[in-house]
Amino acid sequence: NHLGHGAEAPRLGWFAKRNGWSRLVEDLKTVMDSLAAPGLPRVLLGHSMGSFLAREYALRYPDGLEALVLSGTGWHPKPLCMAGLLPAKALCLLGRGHKPSALLDRLAFSANNRPFAKAGGTACDWLSRDAQQVQAYVTDPLCGFVFTASGFADLFDGLLNLSRTARLKNLPGGLPVLLLSGSRDPVGGMGKG
């Protein structure tokens, strides 16, 4: 599990006191290093938030990575990142960093569900075409939990760093990258990637 996720997380949606995004990436590096095996290619697959972490990992640690697979990823321009980062940091400064933020959750995710909104639907209908899978996600306490204000600040900070196109020069020119996106995935621009 990522930091702030899973049954062992001390607080769901909270990553670290400081530099949570970097801590997530370093945690991923620890996992990647522990899985390294001589003679086997190192391929990193990330989905959704994991795709953003995989992109950051590839930018920081491109050596030894043979391929990158990004599923359900997207591009977030600087103004959009700042629109989330500023209120998240303000809540942290007001001492609410460790508390789940329904406001930031709506800001971050409500637009994803707009094309799928229907009577009797859920706020998570955008996640899958399979209504049973959506319901399983909604009822699982370890899925769809609301991040803390600090967790959102870390996420928006990470997305802001990924929006800096000058950083792309850190990727090796020959690194194979496979982009996957569902045809109705709002994070991937409805299949446009």
Which role does the model predict for each range below?
Residues 3-18:
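Glycine-rich "HGGG/HGxG" loop immediately N-terminal to the catalytic nucleophile
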